[in-house]
């Protein structure tokens, strides 16, 4: 799944970044949607609010698959209110064990006032060791830039925007049209 020309590799063509600092959580994504080597759209929104605006969620991967997973996550949050980690683990269990869900191709970052998590189809729910996490083709560039800026910038959004711009300058599957969601924590 690493060849960007392969249509199955479509989930690699994006960047989503989450940064926590000084009472603020910010999640950003680029807007580029690529199919193989073709840019299909430049202003897609890959970050959004769920659970009544209390949780920020971003995705890399097939859009329909991601929305299916967001709906499932919201159902888990209704069952386990204010327990993002528990809901994420329950979603990961379903994603790993239900045949229908196993075919979904997406990665999710979800965050509330207390935690930031990456949820994968392999059944992983990962909480980053640092206050920064990213996914997608430009994710490593954005992550490295954000971690490098973290000690020198006071504002989470400033860190996020600068890091995303660096990723957009390096990764051909990431553009400079950013969607930004913030949450006071």
From Swiss-Prot:
Na(+) binds at residues 168, 171, 174. GO terms for biological process: proteolysis involved in protein catabolic process. One of its GO terms (molecular function) is metal ion binding. The active site is at residue 14. It is found in: Cytoplasm. The keyword Phosphoprotein does not apply. Gene3D superfamilies: Glutamine Phosphoribosylpyrophosphate, subunit 1, domain 1 (3.60.20.10). InterPro entries: ATP-dep_Prtase_HsIV_su (IPR022281), Ntn_hydrolases_N (IPR029055), Proteasome_sua/b (IPR001353), Proteasome_suB-type (IPR023333). Disulfide bonds: none annotated. It catalyses: ATP-dependent cleavage of peptide bonds with broad specificity. Allosterically activated by HslU binding. Keywords: Allosteric enzyme, Cytoplasm, Hydrolase, Metal-binding, Protease, Sodium, Threonine protease. It is an enzyme of class 3 (hydrolase). It comes from the Bacteria. Its EC number is 3.4.25.2. GO terms for cellular component: HslUV protease complex; proteasome core complex. Protease subunit of a proteasome-like degradation complex believed to be a general protein degrading machinery. A double ring-shaped homohexamer of HslV is capped on each side by a ring-shaped HslU homohexamer. The assembly of the HslU/HslV complex is dependent on binding of ATP. Belongs to the peptidase T1B family. HslV subfamily. This is ATP-dependent protease subunit HslV. It comes from Hyphomonas neptunium (strain ATCC 15444).
